[in-house]
């Protein structure tokens, strides 16, 4: 009998692994080409004839913070299908649990804290046992019901420079346990295939109430209430197994604190022991090393994935993009560029977005380029930059300076060049594709390098020698360009020729 069952068991196990591996690969793997996207296009005819820099036009004050809204009714936001919000969370401020109809990327501009995305069906892996002393032994049923004092899903520490990925419909909260305000920029992709509602950001509150950001255009201010307020008290009480009084508390009918509330004595949360010990001892440097080590931990035991290594419940939801050691390209005289995509941040396969952080030194340039498969939402975090954007007709649709706190939407395929000013420049670009690609015009691995000399000579009516210089003036520079004059370009080229 055992000899008959052994093949059946083996076949069943193989089938289980195959099915689960295929599912995980579909959810987290590269199910689509880098050139493709599950994103919906805009249903309206869009004309990006004149781009503009954006700043928040409306702020809503909560008890322990502020939510700042950009003008998402503007055609540029409507056509690209993105929504942008900036939040300031004061020390001991708690952003109440909520979820959104679109996938989001969050960049931490300043501060540190804790966040807790809650994935459905995942276990409460953080557990704290009761400390019982001097009490009689409990019965089995009592022991089971009181086995843990608290249990919840994994919480994640974040710090300045982190990018946090939030899939559509996944509830999350955020708490500032630092000494300075947390400042974060939220970019939500509403044309993402995960959103089957209209292309307008809808925040579903699990607690608290907030003022409607569109209310400033109306005479009567509206308030958004949490989802429990729409249920009857009796039905809610029965469904959750609580008293009517508790059910009314969940509805937060008279709660005027807003979406960011103050926790007077701080949150008591379950955290890894080493992190707590470092906080108590005040060893900042040690804490940073610990956190960085946490960020660098990979779920993969080797360089490849079989689809089972990283699933919903073990997804890394944040990655630091400011760490210089993570830079993909670096020029010591110009700056660095760091990319986050599905290759180094697998959860982006669910979010269907990616991010690029650019740090340019004094007067450095970024190679002219265009985005092949994504729109780009550029947010300046430091300094100033001169930016020019050109459309398909060769018309300049933006020619101006971007400063800290401003935002610019660059449509797909529009050519752009950026030059840092005297104080340098740093910005983060949110892309509407999980594996965004750009095509550089100059420098190494660029369009000019790829074209034959005769093609360039005849296209621009220049000599073959000038075409050769055009291809190689920038030497092996890629991405960030050193700020030098044209005469120096010739010197670089002549030196290369003589060698």
Curated annotation (Swiss-Prot):
Complexes and interactors: Hexamer; each subunit is composed of an acidic and a basic chain derived from a single precursor and linked by a disulfide bond.
UniProt-listed GO biological process terms: seed development
Residue ranges of every copy of the Cupin type-1 domain listed in the record: 51-248, 319-468
Cystine residue pairs: 46-79, 122-313
InterPro entries according to UniProt: 11S_seedstore_CS (IPR022379), 11S_seedstore_pln (IPR006044), Cupin_1 (IPR006045), RmlC-like_jellyroll (IPR014710), RmlC_Cupin_sf (IPR011051), Seed_Storage-Functional (IPR050253)
Swiss-Prot/TrEMBL keywords: Disulfide bond, Seed storage protein, Signal, Storage protein
Function: Seed storage protein.
A GO term for molecular function: nutrient reservoir activity
SMART domains from the UniProt entry: Cupin_1
Signal peptide from the UniProt entry: 1-24
Family of this protein: Belongs to the 11S seed storage protein (globulins) family.
Source organism per UniProt: Oryza sativa subsp. japonica (Rice)
CDD domains: cupin_11S_legumin_C, cupin_11S_legumin_N
Record's protein name: Glutelin type-A 1
